[in-house]
Amino acid sequence: MIPPQEASARRREIEDKLKQEEETLSFIRDSLEKSDQLTKNMVSILSSFESRLMKLENSIIPVHKQTENLQRLQENVEKTLSCLDHVISYYHVASDTEKIIREGPTGRLEEYLGSMAKIQKAVEYFQDNSPDSPELNKVKLLFERGKESLESEFRSLMTRHSKVISPVLVLDLISADDELEVQEDVVLEHLPESVLQDVIRISRWLVEYGRNQDFMNVYYQIRSSQLDRSIKGLKEHFRKSSSSSGVPYSPAIPNKRKDTPTKKPIKRPGRDDMLDVETDAYIHCVSAFVRLAQSEYQLLMGIIPEHHQKKTFDSLIQDALDGLMLEGENIVSAARKAIIRHDFSTVLTVFPILRHLKQTKPEFDQVLQGTAASTKNKLPGLITSMETIGAKALEDFADNIKNDPDKEYNMPKDGTVHELTSNAILFLQQLLDFQETAGAMLASQETSSSATSYNSEFSKRLLSTYICKVLGNLQLNLLSKSKVYEDPALSAIFLHNNYNYILKSLEKSELIQLVAVTQKTAERSYREHIEQQIQTYQRSWLKVTDYIAEKNLPVFQPGVKLRDKERQMIKERFKGFNDGLEELCKIQKAWAIPDTEQRDKIRQAQKSIVKETYGAFLHRYSSVPFTKNPEKYIKYRVEQVGDMIDRLFDTSA
């Protein structure tokens, strides 16, 4: 049981807590009442604000919509005014631009094209909106006048600034390709940069708005004339240079043989030099055409529309190309006439030209890509013509060597080298510079097709066979000509000189190697022929040495007195030798052996034989009393006989 005091204390404690809780509850109740009151007040305020906001919205939105409508109306008015201004401006275009169009585009192309753009727009406007308006006719007329002025300006710019390329610059352009050292590229400025830009702008305008291609015809006509005159100027430059300072350097004909004559004996002063100049000039003109045509195409690409470039370029190069082809055909025609005259040295002008044309053909083909077939076929046609005429020249030359009719009146009286031999060798030597070309000519006739499809070895063998044929024909002709001489010894000297000249000429040049391709024993064969003729010549001395040859001498007993018959025989032997020696020396002194080595060899051999025979004869009979006047019969000492033989083949002795 809890004590009364403790229970009383706990009751008071509980009562205190209860009181506190009641106070707290009362505070909370008051707070809730205040909160409710505040909430009611806030709801009332918000309701009032919402009501006012709705009133404001109901009054502002109509105003806003009205304002938007007003702004839209204002914009429409402004656009309408702008359109009206724009339309009205079309009616003023003619008057605003007439002065500029009348004065032309020279010096103010930018402004002029701007005016033309305005006129173009005016034309389009009136055509779409007022096709019956008189203003349309005005602006159309003004547009046509402006277009004509632009076309005229295009022509004027091209005419004024398209200059002929100087020959020196063209030569630099050509030679730049052949220089081994690195050099700056040779740049051709066909038109000043500012002019070029104007021309490009005009051409583009004419293509886009002018609907006219006449300016392309103007372009190719002007540039074609310039190209043609540039090439003709180069040709004229060669002619003038040749008359004053010799033939200009030619990259197309390098390393001309200085020790090899290139022509027959000159009949007309300067004629052969002129042929060289014409040939060199033509070769340079061909190279110039390729380089200038390449440059022209680069220029054309910036001015002419792409789909018209090939056709315009084809037209542009025609005059210059036709000029080259015509000149080439004239060369072929001249060669054909020269063949008829048997002037084969003139025909040789075809060889360097043909070689250069074939070397240049790949570049030619590249330049002419896209041109008409007739244009592309011009060079191959000329090459074929030259191959054909060249092959005919070679064939006729070989036949002419075999059938040369000249005999008596044209035979050298001293037995020296015949003109036919020297000309034949010179002709063959010149072929060395054009081995591939000549071989291709022969191959083209052998196969009836282009020789380019055959290797160089095939052509080389054909050329070797041809040279052997010419040499064989020459040998037959020389044998025939040698029969004109009544003296077999002179005939032998003639053949010896010609055979020796042929052999030496073959050895000095590459001809001997070329001949050896198909005839390995040619050199040995010529040496045998030469030796045979020397032996034939030496037999002419038998009529002299037979008088004193030991086998023909009678035997005398020493100390026995000679009979009259024996003395007379000795006298006849001395006299026969003396007369024969004098006669041969007199005759053969006028003969010629141009080769010093051969001349000395023949003299020495003959001198050795005669001196030995005469010395033995003289030794045997000089002390024999066969005459009272020994000086009458013993006219020469052995040394004198040798001296006389040393003067053979020497008219100055």
From Swiss-Prot:
One of its GO terms (cellular component) is exocyst. Residues 238-272 are annotated as: Disordered. Its main location: cytoplasm. It is a peripheral membrane protein. Residues 5-42, 63-85 form a coiled coil. Residues 1-384 are annotated as: SEC8 and ARHQ binding. Component of the exocyst complex involved in the docking of exocytic vesicles with fusion sites on the plasma membrane. In adipocytes, plays a crucial role in targeting SLC2A4 vesicle to the plasma membrane in response to insulin, perhaps directing the vesicle to the precise site of fusion. It is required for neuron survival and plays an essential role in cortical development. This is Exocyst complex component 7. Belongs to the EXO70 family. It is found in: Cytoplasm, Cytosol; Cell membrane; Midbody, Midbody ring. The C-terminus is required for translocation to the plasma membrane. It comes from Rattus norvegicus. Keywords: Cell membrane, Coiled coil, Cytoplasm, Exocytosis, Membrane, Phosphoprotein, Protein transport, Transport.
